[in-house]
Amino acid sequence: MSSAVETVTKLVTPILEEQNFELVEVEFVKEGKNWFLRVFIDKEGGIDIEECAFVSEKLSEKLDAMDPDPIPQAYFLEVSSPGAERPLKKESDYEQAVGKYIHISLYQAVDGEKQIEGTLVHLDSEQLTLSVKIKTRVKEMTFERKNIAKARLAIQF
């Protein structure tokens, strides 16, 4: 985790706790020539634009008040909901995703694939099982949790 992400996580957490919001993820990424500091937040029933703006304003105030500046380069601050394809980070995220369609990225390929989508049917501390449609048939596939690089909710087409 970068120092910018750690700093922002520490700064935004009390703001979110005060409002009963949840921190989903903080990322600091360069896209083209620009840097983006993205803070994804949520709450029971979903987050709205006014709530995102409130958090953005409070976080900006805290960042601007720090000396020295914790993020010396210019960047764009974005505070938003995680959207329909919410990342699965915490154990509770995975538990809430049982029965839902998800996308996983693997460190090592399984059956020649590193990107797999399916319905999460089972979960324990070591593995998760997806119901995956391969051509015309449905197959259950089990994956070691330690082989999962990233996971998120997905939209099924």
Curated annotation (Swiss-Prot):
One of its GO terms (biological process) is translation. Its main location: cytoplasm. InterPro entries: Ribosome_maturation_RimP, RimP_C, RimP_C_sf, RimP_N, RimP_N_sf. The keyword Isomerase does not apply. SUPFAM superfamilies: YhbC-like, C-terminal domain, YhbC-like, N-terminal domain. Keywords: Cytoplasm, Ribosome biogenesis. It is found in: Cytoplasm. Pfam families: DUF150_C (PF17384), RimP_N (PF02576). One of its GO terms (cellular component) is cytosol. The keyword Calcium does not apply. It comes from the Bacteria. Required for maturation of 30S ribosomal subunits. Belongs to the RimP family. This is Ribosome maturation factor RimP. It comes from Enterococcus faecalis (strain ATCC 700802 / V583). The lineage of its organism: Bacteria, Bacillati, Bacillota, Bacilli, Lactobacillales.
